[in-house]
Every structure is written in structure tokens, then in C-alpha cells.
Amino acid sequence: MALSKEDILKWLEEAKTAEVVELITAIEEKFGVTAAAVAVAAGPGPAAGAEEQTEFDVMLVSFGDSKINVIKEVRAITGLGLGEAKALVEAVPKAVKEGVSKADAEEIKKKLEAVGAKVEIK
């Protein structure tokens, strides 16, 4: 007489833990399998496959109330002439520096924010 699925489930409900462990061990040996949980293959996470960003752009978003001081700081950072620095500041949002390291980008951001500018690092 073959056992039905219901018969097996009923036996498992009534069996002691030791009996279930013995059954699992016997099944593992008989069929060459393990009862270890199967890891589900998940898709890549949001950052998987993407390289860590090494170059950053410092974007001037707003010059705030101190346009002249921001122009002076942009000149010091970029080495641009007065007219070029003024045009850059007035063309916000605009990149002040592109392709710089994270440390340099943070330093530039700090300098510009100190004179009243609003800055983003991208």
C-alpha cells in the first residue's frame, strides 16, 4: 500500500523531533541530497555591477547673496580671469570643476559654501 501525501504529513505532525531528524538523515543518505536551505538567486542590487565613482563634478547651484565673493573664490579655484569667472557664476547651475577626486570636490565645496554659494557634488 502506497502512502499518500496526507498520510506522510499526518505522521510528521505526530512524530517526535528525533524521528523527523532520523527520517531527514535517511532521505539525505538514500538520495544523496541535503536538507540545507536553497539560496534563491536574487537579481543584482542597485549598486551591483556599478563601479565606485572616482571622479566628481563640483556644480555651482546658486551664488546666494555674495556674488562678488563667489566670483573671487571661483577665480582662485579655477584660475580663470575675472570676466570668465563672472560668466561662470552667472550661468548657474554650472560646473566649477569636473573630474576631480572626492577629497578635492569636498574641499572646493567647502570653500564655495564658506562664501555663501550653494554647491552640489555629482
Swiss-Prot record:
It comes from the Bacteria. Keywords: Ribonucleoprotein, Ribosomal protein. GO terms for molecular function: mRNA binding; structural constituent of ribosome. Pfam families: Ribosomal_L12, Ribosomal_L12_N. One of its GO terms (biological process) is translation. InterPro entries: Ribosomal_bL12 (IPR000206), Ribosomal_bL12_C (IPR013823), Ribosomal_bL12_C/ClpS-like (IPR014719), Ribosomal_bL12_oligo (IPR008932), Ribosomal_bL12_oligo_N_sf (IPR036235). GO terms for cellular component: cytosolic large ribosomal subunit. Gene3D superfamilies: 3.30.1390.10, Single helix bin (1.20.5.710). Signal peptide: none annotated. Forms part of the ribosomal stalk which helps the ribosome interact with GTP-bound translation factors. Is thus essential for accurate translation. Belongs to the bacterial ribosomal protein bL12 family. PANTHER family: 39S RIBOSOMAL PROTEIN L12 (PTHR45987), LARGE RIBOSOMAL SUBUNIT PROTEIN BL12M (PTHR45987:SF4). Homodimer. Part of the ribosomal stalk of the 50S ribosomal subunit. Forms a multimeric L10(L12)X complex, where L10 forms an elongated spine to which 2 to 4 L12 dimers bind in a sequential fashion. Binds GTP-bound translation factors. This is Large ribosomal subunit protein bL12. It comes from Borrelia hermsii (strain HS1 / DAH). The lineage of its organism: Bacteria, Pseudomonadati, Spirochaetota, Spirochaetia, Spirochaetales.
